[in-house]
Amino acid sequence: PAVYDQRQTPRGVAYVNDAQGAYAQVEDGWYSGMFVGAVEWQPGIEYPGNEVASEKIVACYFAASIWGDTEGRTLDDQVTEPVTIAGLPGYRTTATVNFAKAPMEKTSATSLTVIVLDTPQGPSVFMLETAVGVAEHEEAAAEALESLTGVA
């Protein structure tokens, strides 16, 4: 989507390699983002499957040191469900990161969506991190999800 006009490699994302992301500024120092990448598990550890991978990526992202001056962070409303996209099986995990205290004026929460699919190249991920209440970003994220996955 046009509002996601900044490109960079995502940070704070465990188990993901070769990722490229697009970002939209919410306000100074805070962004909504989306990216695609390859899922790479820990060397010497058997890949646990797409369901566990999608859940672990969300959990590790929540625990990462990327949340700036926010306080009282909680991971709420987590749901994991099977999906099939373009004939490729996988799992989608959604959750909301709520902040008890945040320096931002436009949002106090972030919506997370992680989709891990089996692809011919191995497990792949599509992730959205969207500032809740920023309508332009929420609409663009929904549009991107629909265009890439056919899943609304």
Residue ranges and their predicted role:
Residues 2, 58-66, 146-150:
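Sec-exported extracytoplasmic/periplasmic mature domains
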Residues 26, 34-38, 54-62, 112-114, ...:
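Generic hydrophobic, helix-prone segments enriched in Leu/Val/Ile
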Residues 31-39, 71, 119-122, 126:
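A generic structural signal for ordered alpha-helices
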Residues 40, 44, 76, 124-131:
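A near-ubiquitous, low-amplitude feature marking generic local secondary-structure context
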Residues 46-54, 134-141:
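Solvent-exposed, acidic/flexible segments
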Residues 85-152:
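Short, well-structured beta-strand
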